[in-house]
Amino acid sequence: MENISGVKKKERYPVEIKAYPYLQDHYFEGQAILPAVETLIILATVAVANFPQTNICLQKQARFPRFLSIDPQEQIKKVFADITEAADGSLSVTISTMAKAKTGIISRTMEHAYVEFGLTQAKEYPATPLPDFKHLGGKLFNVPAAAIYRELVPFGKAYQNIIGELSLSPEGAIAQLYGGEGEANDDLIGSPFPLDAALHVACCWGQRYAGIVAFPVGFAERIIYRKTKKERKYVGIIIPVNISREPLMFDALIYDLDGIIYESLSGIQMRDVSQGRLRPPDWIKAGL
């Protein structure tokens, strides 16, 4: 485990994920999959339920190596969480399932998500002003939300949370984000929908400037300064950091409409998990 020494103990806990109908709106190649942002809520829930002192608003070294599918008939998705507690009190949590080999004799562990939670309190609110979209740099290319969710990120209504127009430039992207609705939990670490929509922004940027349809597979650090809430509006900014090869690397900032920062993410990793089966439409590259 990176930056953690003196591991104290590892425990396994059964976890039941309630498969709310809105989760069926998040899918890949026709199969509903649990979004990374929802998985982070589950990881945080397991952590504080067993170690209440954990700072779940400081998340590090997250990875999402494989999708966790949700069948339409499922009401409860059963998984398990492995929690490793370090000597300093910090935690790492893994969500996994068991898969049997074709022989039906041997089972193996399939990891779906991993994150490390810090022990220390989150950093002080940074004095990071909300930049004007006109100052992104480079020629702007605007995409209506309707076109995004029709052709670029074709998810169902619950996960259509970019509002208005997305502005893209070689130096970044900015969009207004919606806090979402429905049964999603916004108490622990905030609503999952603004961050999910910010990742859609990164996906759109990758389609225009890198020519691939990339999904999030991890991040280096996420700091939650304030919790986003459902039914509220935010502004998301994506900054490309390293796009010379996969995974594409981005940083992200989420503000409210008054310019107050709510979240920052660094080292977001985006990869074409379809292995080229999904391709951007030609129009997204117009004018390049």
Please place each PLM-identified region on the residue numbering.
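Acyl-thioester-processing domains in fatty-acid/polyketide/NRPS systems
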Residues: 1-288
